[in-house]
């Protein structure tokens, strides 16, 4: 099971144009993220998330074990100064292009370096996921950011996608999901979904392996639109 997650504004951004993203969503989503980490074998983020947020990717707000922390940086642009490469609160796997790993090189700070083939159509995403499965990581949580989650989604490697939407309008900034365009709406995916309230935010939990009409699986606990006014 591979699950992607993004927290975004009403207008579809995960950060401002300057990269300020802490925090688009509220405290309830932070707790949810920690719960998802605790339930996962591995948590994956891209280089942009590490560079912008310097996350720990550990479990702190709920009981549970720390997952394997995985940083996907195919272009190898990150220095070893970030917390995932300097602390020992949990194991870290640094995945980059095999072409950028020097002979005999195995470590980046406290992290283990693994090179993968990034020349395939998925840009190395498929190889990275295969690597995790070979290490026994079957429950994978792709926590961000937009580029990495979009790459997993474009490669059809996500089983579920969670989108937390906060009641904020950013106007312009770093987008959430960006995929190859479709000319017709009939070609666009409409996955089956469930809706959950998280404090002031709303979480859409989408099953990407099952299509549904817009009316399918509406949560009965969410009031219908005729009660808005």
Language-model-detected regions and their locations in the chain:
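Enzymes that bind and transform nitrogen-containing heteroaromatic metabolites
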Residues: 1-229
